[in-house]
């Protein structure tokens, strides 16, 4: 199964996406950037679904930049998930290397369709 990493500090969001994707993908979960980066090193997921605003030393945009500037991880597809839906937020994420941007509340089926389209 293809590994997909869900990174969000809200367990209900992780659970919703995990249930939606769990039958087709190996779902990995992390609640912050530190544990997510550890999961990236250990499992090298094909796709990361990454919350923008997270607690800790690194937010989602900083983690995105770390992934996309590292030659060992730059090929991982990253979709940002955020409550911030302004055009400037989308543009900032794209400039840092985001492959997609979903605004909360999002449709888990839409996210799953995007994930499927990237691995087929």
Write out the residue ranges for each language-model feature.
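C-terminal output helix
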Residues: 106-115
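Active-site beta3 strand of CheY-like receiver
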Residues: 43-50, 54
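Helix N-cap/capping motif at the beta->alpha junctions
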Residues: 29-38, 59-60
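Conserved sequence signature across two-component system core domains
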Residues: 7-8, 30, 48
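Short amphipathic alpha-helix used as the core "switch/output" element in two-component signaling
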Residues: 38, 61-74
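Alpha4 helix (beta4-alpha4-beta5 surface) of REC/receiver domains from two-component response regulators
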Residues: 58, 62, 85-102, 113
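Two-component/phosphorelay signaling modules centered on CheY-like receiver
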Residues: 11-28
């Amino acid at each position: 199964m293809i590994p997909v990493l869900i990174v969000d500090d809200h367990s209900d969001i992780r659970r919703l996406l995990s249930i939606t994707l769990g039958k087709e993908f190996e779902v990995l979960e992390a609640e912050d950037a530190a544990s997510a980066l550890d999961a990236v090193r250990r499992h090298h997921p094909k796709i990361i679904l990454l919350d923008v605003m997270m607690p800790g030393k690194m937010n989602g945009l900083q983690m995105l930049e770390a992934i996309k500037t590292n030659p060992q991880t730059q090929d991982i597809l990253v979709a940002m998930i955020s409550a911030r839906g302004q055009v400037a937020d989308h543009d900032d994420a794209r400039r840092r290397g985001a492959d997609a941007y979903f605004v909360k509340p999002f449709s888990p089926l839409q996210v799953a369709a995007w994930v499927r389209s990237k691995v087929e």
